[in-house]
């Protein structure tokens, strides 16, 4: 087995004594640092490489901290409108994953880079920590590499804000494949609308 296979097996056993100790120490370190911080190399090199990372010029990795739990509805001065049924503030569940939120925050802060992918690295009772792989689309090495230069096209600007990354496609319900799965297209919202709209055509 190669080295990456051993690393993968280590991360599969997160409850082992070694990993529990390591994760606790790392989590303490992460808490002392800013919410978005650049790191020199990925914490999980096997995972990063599976998601497209290469240890070469133009690729950067940032660690992002996201607060766990539900999303409170922002209501200025507590003023809510409509019927009591729709006036909830605290018990609401955000439809997007925390991983997609981490990608969004990294993408907003680093506007000149393109978000490629992300993965989980740690969590405690308050926060989840993700590492986001970003690509410098202006770098010559990236522009000359046929495997990654697709991301240099202008259509991929802020793909994380439009649900085009892997995490984005997952919360949009577009991850699956195969027979009958095309019924979920073009989106969950469009599918719901199509199935719940009564259409009485003139000639039927």
Curated annotation (Swiss-Prot):
Pfam families listed in its UniProt record: Ribosomal_L15e
GO BP terms: cytoplasmic translation
GO CC terms in record: cytosolic large ribosomal subunit
Coiled-coil blocks: none
Alphabetical UniProt keywords: Ribonucleoprotein, Ribosomal protein
Keyword Ribonucleoprotein: yes
Keyword set includes Ribonucleoprotein: yes
InterPro entries tied to this protein: Rbsml_eL15_core_dom_sf (IPR024794), Ribosomal_eL15 (IPR000439), Ribosomal_eL15_CS (IPR020925), Ribosomal_uL23/eL15/eS24_sf (IPR012678)
GO molecular function: RNA binding; structural constituent of ribosome
Xref: Gene3D superfamilies: Ribosomal protein l15e (3.40.1120.10)
Domain of life: Eukaryota
NCBIfam families: PRK04243.1
Similarity comment: Belongs to the eukaryotic ribosomal protein eL15 family.
PANTHER family membership: LARGE RIBOSOMAL SUBUNIT PROTEIN EL15 (PTHR11847:SF4), RIBOSOMAL PROTEIN L15 (PTHR11847)
Name this polypeptide is given: Large ribosomal subunit protein eL15y
Lineage: Eukaryota, Viridiplantae, Streptophyta, Embryophyta, Tracheophyta
Gene: SB62
